Each structure stands twice: as structure tokens, then as C-alpha cells.
Amino acid sequence: MMITLRKLPLAVAVAAGVMSAQAMAVDFHGYARSGIGWTGSGGEQQCFQATGAQSKYRLGNECETYAELKLGQEVWKEGDKSFYFDTNVAYSVNQQNDWESTDPAFREANVQGKNLIEWLPGSTIWAGKRFYQRHDVHMIDFYYWDISGPGAGIENIDLGFGKLSLAATRSTEAGGSYTFSSQNIYDEVKDTANDVFDVRLAGLQTNPDGVLELGVDYGRANTTDGYKLADGASKDGWMFTAEHTQSMLKGYNKFVVQYATDAMTTQGKGQARGSDGSSSFTEELPDGTKINYANKVINNNGDMWRILDHGAISLGDKWDLMYVGMYQNIDWDNNLGTEWWTVGVRPMYKWTPIMSTLLEVGYDNVKSQQTGDRNNQYKITLAQQWQAGDSIWSRPAIRIFATYAKWDEKWGYIKDGDNISRYAAATNSGISTNSRGDSDEWTFGAQMEIWW
């Protein structure tokens, strides 16, 4: 009995330590993909993306190892009030060797405080670097509303008919502004901070199982005293977004309309661009005529329209389906815009709750505003997959795949040595372009993908 009693304080201490450790447990989340692939004509796996398109169909068409490792913890809680600390470090390498060193990207480091304002119950205030309410199409890895970066804001203010969120974030351009010396020449180039102010109203009930989200983003270049933007720079711009989400067939459909102006048109997702520098080069035509191109990447004046429909649904016990259809038109005053439309489907047939076959078919068509020519690409992937569950979203997954791509490109961006301009040219231009011409290729390999 004496021995048992002597052991009791130790047991209590151990139990208390275990409970304390559980109470302070760190949340571990993340995403990763990696694999190996080959190309039919030889060499490592190639990936296929139409020139001028902002994304590609990703199944069996990813050529890098990428990972995001998220660590977070609720560090304080009292009643319904709490503070949460969140971090995210990301890595990307070419998956060519065992040892591939890279500089990590510190993508998130923020604190979120919930229910801290008595008269705004349910709201969250936050500050730091953050992935902020991102909207994307998973099938093509395309982010159409994403103002992520260092920032601060308040979100989920309950208005009764919807929830209001306000945020300010920053995305900096290298070499975006300059000052003058006494001789009126460029004296010093300085990075330009582009600020974005974001207002969103979400959760607006429109119909049974349907909700609407509305958003306005204003982006502007914020120059340092003593510096000025390059002449003609796109100093600011707006983006307006309306997204309707319909819950259906054990999944969802999202219909999106977006309009952007000037500095908000380049990326078209809510981050300002257009204060960057400029360069020039000369093209010599076959008849000896020389044309000088001023590659003024500072000029994004114009507008962008985007109409997008995408979703993921279940078609019964054995079938799931992802799909996307999008039209995007960037019309710039400098005639360097593009018209891009894409359509694709990814059906999944489930042989068992953990084994499936996937087929992804995607088509891209991109027209150059400058040349009037079009680039197009078909891409088809067949994959056999083993995944942790019977949903098209189930991960981790291990898949083996074969991919075929066929493209016919009539234009490319003009190249001057290793530098690629935003100026477009037909494939028979006097200066080489990065157009891929008319060809096809196939690849095969294996890949893992996981999120948790």
C-alpha cells in the first residue's frame, strides 16, 4: 500500500501533463504533391499549357514537388473569446534529384481574434500574412479571387441578412517607381507597394440552397515620398465580383461574374499590378525593316471581363464529376490583351470505396489582341487512383496516369535572347517567339497528392 501511495503523486503529475499537452496541442495542416514522370519522346515529364493561358488542366500534368506545411494553435481562450496563431511555409522543387535545395516561402503568419468586440458577436479581427478567403477552381489550379499577403481586417460581421468582411492587403512590385537626379536620368529604382482594399458581403440567401457573395476590391500603387511612378503607369484599378453558389447533388455549382479595370486587370484576381519598369528591343523583318518595341509593362490601362462556371457533384454511388467553363477577355489600351476561354470535365468512376478511375479532358483557346491569331490545346489524362475515401475530394491519393496533349499555336510572346516580352507576334516573326507551333506529345507517370 505504501508503495502504491508513493506512486500516486507521480501518476497525478503525469496525467496532468498529458491533459495539459492535449489542451495545448498544435494543429498540423497542409498540402503536398510529388511524383515521377516520363515523356514519350524521351526525358523527364513535360507539362502542357497553352501560350497565353493563365492556368492548365492539372491531373497528370504537374511537373514539380510542392508542399505547404501549416502549424497553428489556439493560444488563448476565455468563454467564446479566443486568439489563434497560424503559420504556413511552402516549398517547390523540380523533382529531378534526391537533394534539391530551395528557399522556403513564408506564406502565412497571422493572429486571428474571435468574438473580441462585444458589439460584433461572431466576428474575427486579424493581422499578419494570410491566405484570405481565396476562391479557386481546383481542376485547373486557378485562383480568380485572391488578395493574399500581409494585411489586416475584420470578417464575418453578422448583418442579419449576410456577413460583411473588410480587409487591406499588400503585394509589392520590384522596380515599380523611380526618382530623378539633377541630370534628369533614372537615379534609383525602388520597389512599389501595391495596396488592396477589399469589401465582401457573403451568405445572401437567393433561393433554396443558394447563396450569393458580392465583393469590391480597389488597388493602388503607394509610392514613397521623393519617388514617382514611371510615366503612363497604371496607378490604380477596381475589381467587382459576384458569385452564386448552389448546393446540389451532394456537391456544388459556382457561377461567377467579374469585372476589373486598369491595375487590377493583369492578374485578374484582386491584386494590383502596373507600376513596374519598362524595356525595349528591335525586331528586324525579312525585308530589312527594323521595328523598335518599347515593352511598357507599366501600361495595364483597360478592362477585364470574366464569366466562370465550375463545380463538383455526385452522379450516383459510382460516379463523381468536376467541371469548369470560363470566358475571360482582357482588353488593354496598348493592344496587348488576350481573349481566353476554357472548358473541361473530370469524371471519376469508383470501383471500390478506395479505388477509382479518372478521366480529365480539357480545352484552351487563347486569342492575341495584338495579332488576332489563336492558340489552342487539347489535353486528355487517364488515371488509375487509390484514395482515402469514395469522394472526388478524398485525399491522400496515389495515382498512375497517362496524358496526351495536342496543340496548334499561331502566336507567341516575342523573345529577345532569354527575355520574353509581353508583345505578341505570329510564329513567322523575324524574332523568335515562344510559340510551340503545331505538335503533340504524351507523358506517363505516378503522383501522390495529399491535404489534411
UniProtKB/Swiss-Prot annotation:
It is found in: Cell outer membrane. GO terms for molecular function: maltodextrin transmembrane transporter activity; maltose transporting porin activity. Gene3D superfamilies: Porin, LamB type (2.40.170.10). It catalyses: beta-maltose(in) = beta-maltose(out). It is a multi-pass membrane protein. The record marks Y143 as: Important in sugar transport. Keywords: Cell outer membrane, Ion transport, Membrane, Porin, Signal, Sugar transport, Transmembrane, Transmembrane beta strand, Transport. Residues 1-25 form the signal peptide. The keyword Transmembrane applies. The keyword ATP-binding does not apply. It comes from the Bacteria. Its main location: membrane. GO terms for biological process: monoatomic ion transport. PANTHER family: CRYPTIC OUTER MEMBRANE PORIN BGLH-RELATED. Belongs to the porin LamB (TC 1.B.3) family. Involved in the transport of maltose and maltodextrins. HAMAP family: LamB. Homotrimer formed of three 18-stranded antiparallel beta-barrels, containing three independent channels. This is Maltoporin.
